[in-house]
């Protein structure tokens, strides 16, 4: 594979793929050198550090082997992380310190119950006197080493208290207190900037504990200790929250209430520090067994959360999908989803009791074809489920966002639970966006994006680019002081960058060849026709982006251009005689027939359809192992007949019923020649019985009806001025004046949503005659229709979607966004 160039001081340029990645059917010429240089000069960021291992200069003779080796190594690192038995999570100093404070004897005497934790604390103090989580230390790469967070102070103070409690390591204690004193302004700033989070309550309470133990924190007096405890306790409906931060509330906590949240494994919230804090104040055999298990498993230190396997694995899968590289890890992802589904059916506490994990699991399982009922989310159907939870008190945006995303994966006309969840989560997220605190939240852009663009309006490659450019290689999922493992983020970033940049090179070559085809076919000479090659190719590249599906993209774009030409010919370009001549030629399908061309326009249009369809038929017949050309011809014949029907209606001023209109309109929307032939090239065998099955017909009907209605909503005014009827104007017309055009537009939204949900159900359901990769094509086109026709007629506009087109095909990745 030729090297993907990652300039150390510029944007990523398109990467040239290996010949083995290209089309197996010879539609594309051999790779050519491109003269298009797309280089910017963004600042150097951590994103470039993530891809250094894969950067090879083009002048190096070993760059091809090196690039391939780096890709293989990166995939192996990610694959290791995806295993069901992942590497041990990194130790958490904060949690380990609280475990170290647990006494050996039931009433608090006899020294530490876990002396190995005390020893670990002594061994792992950093040079500046602090104790920091490994993820926090990693975050300093490429940035100032002086950055200190309130979380670092909490971890350090907890370790100081653990050592002081057992009179161990006086020098460690002194250095730790000095670190806290030097950075005390961080804690004070955090306390004044936001409501009391768990770590702030803990820090204030731990400062009080330190003073009660006779420890002197430099630059800290009694007046500096902001005791938030009373405010938390008297805040109604926050019992779960106060239980979670129980280590910071000490003797003022109601420990009997706390233990109501104990899970089957003996823990409180799967949190080592919360469980340990409970044991410090209130002996419990099951809680002690939980901590014993952790130390048996991890040795002398504990992680920030355990178990957190399901959430961390789902998060990893989600990241791979967002970066556009999940196809490289199909087997590993299937194992994770199978395991998650098994836990889902057993109502595992790690899923059911956690809002974020439950939302992610539901969305990912449903989209991957697992049978999950929205009834399992009934405990989240009302906003009180959030307000009265730990996530609610922490104003946990991530949990809200994941639940909101889950609500959009609806596959029935009425899924009341999902509709309710979507309503209240959407309202709360909008409220959060208006708050000043949200402006400091790195999730704010993601929330805005999710609210404005539901997943069914987003084209995959456009989304991948955004996610790559905003990917934070140092980020990790966290709640309070709990970090989840975040290994291999550099490899994920590198793979995403290489994959996207390589695909851009392919896209640019394919589009160049398609432009040549338009000229060779003389389609550019048709003055009446809209020139929509770029848009059609973009819609293919943005949804069918893998290198091996090159022929599908070429077909999609060619037939998209041809259907647009035919549509314009029937609308404005052709006379009645020309239209009848074209229909007759397509019906006979014989270029050597004696039928004369009525005009040069007819000859150009028919020749382009005839030549392209026969070439495609030959190619598809090889893939399928049988002759499919006849079916491809039938698709064009049906389209032209239906278009002629519309012309006859218009000329005779016939007003069809809504049912008559829609039966014809699902054909004249002209997605048949684009999507149906593509089914033959995706890979799976498509016998004639399958291609003509009720299931395939229903997939086509739902996709086409959804697209047609979306188009009608945006075009009814323009078409009305041309004397054309569509579903909006027919609804108003047949109502006898009781429905205005504005009301008709609103009413049309319901069947659009119904069609989309029913289509998604067919796509994600297991079983059926049509293979899943083929069903995905119908869903891809549905998303394309939503993309172009949500908020305007983006297809007819020459500029509305030009920026998106450039982003996917031409503009290189701008990694200056990454941090």
Swiss-Prot record:
Motif DDXXD motif in this chain: 567-571
Keyword Cell cycle annotated: no
GO biological processes: defense response; diterpenoid biosynthetic process; ent-kaurene biosynthetic process; gibberellin biosynthetic process; response to jasmonic acid
Main location: plastid
Transit peptide: 1-58
Catalytic activity: ent-copalyl diphosphate = ent-beyerene + diphosphate; ent-copalyl diphosphate = ent-kaur-16-ene + diphosphate
Induction annotation: Strongly induced in roots by methyl jasmonate (meJA). Induced by drought stress.
GO cellular component, one term: chloroplast
Region (Disordered): 58-77
GO molecular function ontology, one term from the record: terpene synthase activity
Location within or outside the cell: Plastid, Chloroplast
Phenotype upon gene inactivation: Severe dwarf phenotype with reduced shoot growth, reduced crown roots and growth of branch roots, abnormal leaf blade morphology, dark-green leaves, short and wide edges, leaf tips rounded and almost sterile seeds.
Entry cofactors: Mg(2+)
CDD domains the record matches: Terpene_cyclase_plant_C1
Entry superkingdom: Eukaryota
Function, as annotated: Diterpene cyclase involved in jasmonic acid-dependent defense mechanisms in roots by mediating the biosynthesis of labdane-related diterpenoids (LRDs) natural products such as ent-beyerene, an antimicrobial compound. Catalyzes the cyclization of ent-CDP into ent-beyerene as a major and ent-kaurene as a minor product. May be involved in the catalysis of an early step of the gibberellin (GA) biosynthesis pathway.
Alphabetized PANTHER family for the sequence: ENT-COPALYL DIPHOSPHATE SYNTHASE, CHLOROPLASTIC, ENT-KAURENE SYNTHASE-LIKE 3
Family from the record: Belongs to the terpene synthase family.
Domain topic, free-text comment: The Asp-Asp-Xaa-Xaa-Asp/Glu (DDXXD/E) motif is important for the catalytic activity, presumably through binding to Mg(2+).
Name of this chain's protein: Ent-beyerene synthase KSL2, chloroplastic
Gene name, Swiss-Prot/TrEMBL: KSL2
